[in-house]
Amino acid sequence: MPNKGLVLIVEDEDSIRLSLRDYLSKKGYDVLVASDGVGALKQLLDYDVDLIVSDYRMDVLGGDYWIKFLRKYCSTKRIIITSGFLRPDFEIPFDVVYKPFDYHDLEAHIVALMETNPGRQP
């Protein structure tokens, strides 16, 4: 199966992070994982990822600061934010998938974003 791209999953909930990693790997993606924004920074420094799937609410470098970081420093990356909680007054400049989500539906969202958006422009 040809490689479909390198995806970084940023999720503090172990069961979601690991099962999503396994699911996307079986679908042909290379997958990196991080449990918080700090771990994601390390991955982003070491690898040129094609797409980021990130939880919004994480204890370490999550929430509004993580979104601000992504907006400023990852504006050319394809990004999907996942969350069961988003503040209505904070604008998310990326695609959002609400928890709980179906992995098949999330993959369809990833495929669509990879095909239609070669990367965000600053």
Where is each model-derived feature located?
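Active-site residues of response regulator receiver
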Residues: 55
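The feature encodes the CheY-like receiver
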Residues: 59
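C-terminal output helix
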Residues: 21, 101-118
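Two-component/phosphorelay signaling modules centered on CheY-like receiver
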Residues: 13-32
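Acidic, metal-coordinating helix/loop segments flanking the phosphotransfer/catalytic sites
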Residues: 33-51
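Short amphipathic alpha-helix used as the core "switch/output" element in two-component signaling
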Residues: 42, 64-75
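Hydrophobic/aromatic residues positioned on beta-strands within the core alpha/beta folds
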Residues: 81-83
